[in-house]
Amino acid sequence: MPQLNSGXGDELGANDELIRFKDEGEQEEKSPGEGSAEGDLADVKSSLVNESENHSSDSDSEVERRPPPRETFEKPRDYLSEAFRRQQDAAFFKGPPYAGYPFLMIPDLGGITCPMVPSHPALAYLQMKWPLLDSPSTAGLKDARSPSPAHLSNKVPVVQHPHHMHPLTPLITYSNEHFSPGTPPGHLSPEIDPKTGIPRPPHPSELSPYYPLSPGAVGQIPHPLGWLVPQQGQPMYSIPPGGFRHPYPALAMNASMSSLVSSRFSPHMVPPPHHSLHTSGIPHPAIVSPIVKQEPSSGNISPNLSMKSNVVVKKEEEKKPHIKKPLNAFMLYMKEMRAKVVAECTLKESAAINQILGRRWHSLSREEQAKYYELARKERQLHSQLYPSWSARDNYGKKKKRKREKQSPEMENYTKTKKMCVQHFPSDKSCDSPASSHGSMLDSPATPSAALASPREPAATHSEEAQPLSLTTKPEARALSHSAAFLASKSPSSSSLSGHLPSPVGSPLLSRPIPLTSSILSPPGVFPPALQALPLLQAQPLPLVARSSD
């Protein structure tokens, strides 16, 4: 038989060469460019026809399952002409159901009698993005075309690893033969086809025959023990884009399937396939339900248990009776004398009654108090006998816990603001009293000048603008406040102060205490109009002066 030259890639056959298999029920069409490889291709087709004469009906049904043609886009520059040639002949090469899905080999499913016995069914090839021509009977067909980038590297048809596989995608074989676990990866060297003499990769049965499922085939996952070989009457599945065939016999799984299978089975101990898929295409519940349903429940159980345990502990603490501490000597005296004091006095307040009882207790002599101390000692002994494990820390600890639970961050902020306001109350009272004389107003430590004499006072807040000067510490008013403090130290009387004040202020302003409001502390540009308005503001009551200054 004539031998083809195996050295050149694109020169093995004509570029427009088309191949037909008679078992597909289609008529042969010969292209005008078929060359010297016609005899070898006829031998290949005749061998396929002889093997598949009894299975033509199944092959026809497979042709009917084929999806409608769809345009695919080839990224490598070397495949542009080949893609155009394949798309013209839609009778044999038909487009993939999903753009970019790789090559697929469909065996004759009707001829499978035992999954462990290798058979040679008729092979139908669909054109996908990356051709995987691994059958020994079609090596001439594969090598007649331009080699793929994977073929140029190591003569092994390898496709890129998928990047968007479905999390429940297991592995599935496209061959009817079970792999031999002891086959080393060193057999990947190219072999010589006995008919054509063209180098070809080894038979897929010699490699690990496992490919990932496509996302559309997730609903047809087999039983985990019936591994990965399609049974009679079940169609094969398309391979996801760039499906990667592992060179080792080990199973390359994703993260979700490795938790189910890899932890229980070593790669060389996968049982022989003997279970078929569900007829409805629904995966076995042993695959889906343990992973999907148990993961969220495991995350939700722990917080619920912790919440329940905390509630149970709190309820147990509440159920325990509150044990009062034993009474001391003074408490025993109060218990005895309280009724007498209430009868003698008309006071009903508990604090006043306790003060009276305290004075009487201290007025007692040592001998009279010793009686109550003895009663208190007996009380402690009785309490220790009734509650041997009791300690005063139990009650104090409970009180602290209750306070922490009741106190919220809003209440803490509220108490802080209240404390800040209380600090300024004395200065407000001194400024609000109109009866205070001018001398006392300047000499008292709560006066505005004394409050502003130290430059370390904090900055004024927004609420202090409507208040007198004692609460206002704006930088513009520092000079005026220091001058007022200096004058107050030199002249305690109002008459001497009037001579030192500047002329715009004048003596009419000192006829009564000066309400140093925020109008005096305005910026320098607004200072003269504010001083002119001061005589008008003095005719109003003092609370209105602070309001009108806003």
Curated annotation (Swiss-Prot):
Q: Name its species.
A: Xenopus laevis (African clawed frog)
Described function: Participates in the Wnt signaling pathway. Binds to DNA and acts as a repressor in the absence of ctnnb1-A and possibly ctnnb1-B, and as an activator in the presence of these proteins. Required early in development for the establishment of the dorsal body axis in response to maternal Wnt signaling.
Please describe the quaternary structure of this protein: Interacts with csnk1e, ctnnb1-A, ctbp-B, dact1-A and gsk3b. May interact with ase and tle4-A.
Record's protein name: Transcription factor 7-like 1-D
Post-translationally, this protein is described as follows, namely: Phosphorylated. Phosphorylation by csnk1e promotes binding to ctnnb1-A while phosphorylation by gsk3b may reverse this effect.
Give the main location.
nucleus
Q: Which UniProt keywords apply?
A: Activator, Developmental protein, DNA-binding, Nucleus, Phosphoprotein, Repressor, Transcription, Transcription regulation, Wnt signaling pathway
DNA-binding stretch(es), residue numbering of this chain: 323-391
